[in-house]
């Protein structure tokens, strides 16, 4: 199985509104009529001004079954977890236990960013309020 690159975008505007967008190149040798997690709101993409904006990349079937993006938001809203705690819980203790791999990029209503993954690497970047760009590939960076 070889995955194509996926573009995940999440943003917070000056008024505090959150947005998420996810685009995918799909999966090589995918099954005919397969729909991945990217176009499914709550699985691969989700935004809620009260909590966070999340975009996901990974093995879509597991992200759909786990409703990854919405689940992170729900853990923040109902359990009071931080975006980092919620993302870790979903990616490592839900998706991974089902056999799925991948990660998420997200931003919460306060501008805190998560880039959580259960894979050795995931192309990701963020820009801070001063315009400094931070680009990472491997998990230990």
Each predicted region: which residue ranges?
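C-terminal beta-strand edge segments of enzyme domains
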Residues: 114-141
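Short, well-structured alpha-helical segments that form the helix of a local strand-helix-strand
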Residues: 82-96
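Short, small/polar residue-rich loop motifs at catalytic or cofactor-binding pockets
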Residues: 6, 99-101, 120
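Single conserved hydrophobic/aromatic residue that forms the stacking wall/gate
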Residues: 1-9
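Conserved mixed alpha/beta catalytic, RNA-binding, or beta-rich assembly cores of soluble enzyme
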Residues: 24-65, 73-79
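Short beta-strand scaffold segments in enzyme catalytic cores
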Residues: 9-12, 18-20, 102-107, 111-115, ...
């Amino acid at each position: 199985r070889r995955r194509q690159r996926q573009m995940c975008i999440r943003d917070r505007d000056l008024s505090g509104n959150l947005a998420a967008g996810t685009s995918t190149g799909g999966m090589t040798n995918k099954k005919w009529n397969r729909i991945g997690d990217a176009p499914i709101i709550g699985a691969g993409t989700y935004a809620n001004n009260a909590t966070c904006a999340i975009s996901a990349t990974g093995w879509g079937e597991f992200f759909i079954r786990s409703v990854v993006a919405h689940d992170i938001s729900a853990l923040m809203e109902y359990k009071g977890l931080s975006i980092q705690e919620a993302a870790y819980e979903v990616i490592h203790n839900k998706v991974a236990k089902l056999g799925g791999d991948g990660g998420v990029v997200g931003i919460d209503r306060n501008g805190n960013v998560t880039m959580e993954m259960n894979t050795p690497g995931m192309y990701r970047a963020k820009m801070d309020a001063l315009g400094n760009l931070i680009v990472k590939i491997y998990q230990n960076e």
